[in-house]
Amino acid sequence: MAVYTDVAADELADFLSRYDIGDLLSYKGIAEGVENSNFLLHTSRGYFILTLYEKRVARDDLPFFLSLMTHLADSGINCPQPVADREGRTLATLAGRPAAIISFLDGVWPRKPSVVHCAGVGQALAKMHLAGRDFAMKRANALSVAGWRPLFAAAEARADEVQPGLRDFLAAELSYLESGVWPSDLPQGLIHADLFPDNVFFIGDDVSGIIDFTFACNDLLAYDVAICLNAWCFEADHAFNVTKARALLSAYTRERPLDAAEQAALPLLARGAALRFLLTRLVDWLNVPEGALVKPKDPMEYVRKLRFQQNVAGIRDYGVEIAGAVA
């Protein structure tokens, strides 16, 4: 979450008058994240989150995100629920941006994920995948392999400002992943596509909620697992933690076993996931709006993760032996 668009107090008061959520007591911008402008609202009826969707998010996609949250919540997944205004609408406009109010979830995200946290997110991800099977709406993944070339084009001219040689490193990896190696015949379904630690809340050792479905889409289920391996299983010194990976994968496969093809493809999917976040971080790093209340994330973190994944020989390198499982 982040703040790119500020909101005047009188404009916010007029906006909130359309909702039955009590009187506004205070509000503040939330600086974490990189995609949209988010505010914590404190009203006489509790806490809510106000999101203003910025330009990277297409307005036509917003009904998908909002309906998905409702579907998952109805299916027993702890996630925010959209709040409708007095006319039953969950999507509105504020400060020239599409806007929505969602319920507030208790819990905190883990700044230093433990093995227990990794097991929790593995289980939660699998349950979300299963709950999404009967969600009728569809949305293609605009940031899968076909979407990486435009990101590279947007950043290549200045990539070497971040690290000398970065442009050529990215070009080589992108060419490889575009060469026909990317799988298309693995089990597909609804994926979160951005399940980083700051998008999972815990109370103690238990997952209390999954947030931020801005990138949710239909794609390879194992790709979502690969994203989590990169996001949860590396230490602050960039070393891969096999114990965390084993916990995450074991918890996931207890709920939804990976078939043999998914297992074989996981290292390649993790390479692609690393490149995808490296590219979006690089574009954001080079294009932070002046004065924005935002903390751009370091693209070099994902250079190191990509280099690791390039050298993974198979799923055993993630600490597990689950060959023969069936979906």
UniProtKB/Swiss-Prot annotation:
Catalytic activity as recorded in UniProt: L-homoserine + ATP = O-phospho-L-homoserine + ADP + H(+)
GO molecular function list: ATP binding; homoserine kinase activity
EC nos: 2.7.1.39
Pfam family, one: APH
Keywords in alphabetical order: Amino-acid biosynthesis, ATP-binding, Kinase, Nucleotide-binding, Threonine biosynthesis, Transferase
Record pathway: Amino-acid biosynthesis; L-threonine biosynthesis; L-threonine from L-aspartate: step 4/5
Gene3D superfamilies: 3.90.1200.10, Phosphorylase Kinase, domain 1
Any single GO BP term: threonine biosynthetic process
NCBIfam families tied to this protein: PRK05231.1, thrB_alt
HAMAP family per record: Homoser_kinase_2
Family: Belongs to the pseudomonas-type ThrB family.
Protein name as catalogued: Homoserine kinase
Organism listed in the record: Rhodopseudomonas palustris (strain TIE-1)
Gene from which this protein is expressed: thrB
